[in-house]
Amino acid sequence: YTLSLHDALPIYGEGIGIKVCGDMDIDEQFEYRYYTPYFKGSGVTSYADVSVERRIDREAYVGICEDTKVGINLVFYLQNMMEYLRERQLGGRSIKYSSVTLSGLCNEGIILLPVLKSKEQEREQQEDVHNRMLLLSAAKSGDPQAIESLTLDDIDTYSKVSRRLISEDVFTIVDTYIMPYGIECDRYSIMGEILEYRLTRNEITREDICIMKLDVNGLLFDVCVPKREVMGEPAVGRRFKGNVWLQGRINF
């Protein structure tokens, strides 16, 4: 038996709470097995294909999103497990879904200033990202020319970055990034541009919580972090850097 996100108690703030999972015996006595904090994101992060796998250690599931924007498979803790199990029971293996909404729980982070770019540089960067996405899609289909082009692009990028690192800081070269962090498969180190920013309050501890919508390598998702653990002043256009526990829900 699992409490849904709407039933999870207690509710600590806007979209923030604790989900409890456990067993209900014949006397309707609930005994919990584990509980996890959650943070519900907003909007849509990706329309890419998603596969779901059960964790070995407990009754929980992770989603694997294959989005070409980042070039790696993103693994996230599945928030709407009961909804997924219900859809699987009704539809078998042919589960239909529309999109994925990701979110990140973070303990601490740093605010960085944005990289100064001209309109022409922004346009060229968008074109490069679009072309790379097309090449990645073609490479996944087995196109040898696309694979070769990606390899040459990576070599060229490595060479350019190595030269610039002699006189520049890495955070003036890299706008945003997302990469695995630690030994858990759903932990990531991220840096993204702040698109939206607001404050909410933990109703239990009365602590202020920063909620930021980030653009991380073209992926848009919300991150929550305690305000007192953020070094710097968050603002739209600046960048946030931190380590997150990536969660998400599949929109059926």
What are these language model-derived features?
Residues 245-252:
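Short, Lys/Arg- and Gly-enriched loop/turn segments at beta-strand edges
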Residues 181-193, 238:
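Short coil-to-beta-strand transition motifs
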Residues 10-182:
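Long, hydrophobic alpha/beta structural blocks
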Residues 227-242:
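Short nucleic-acid-contacting surface segments enriched for D/E, G, S/T with interspersed K/R
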Residues 1-2, 7-9:
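Short, small-residue-biased leader/transition segments that mark boundaries at the very start
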Residues 195-223:
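OB-fold (S1/OB) nucleic-acid-binding surfaces
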Residues 179, 198-200, 228:
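Eukaryotic intrinsically disordered and solvent-exposed regulatory patches
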Residues 74-76, 222-227:
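Short amphipathic beta-strand/extended segments with alternating polar/hydrophobic composition
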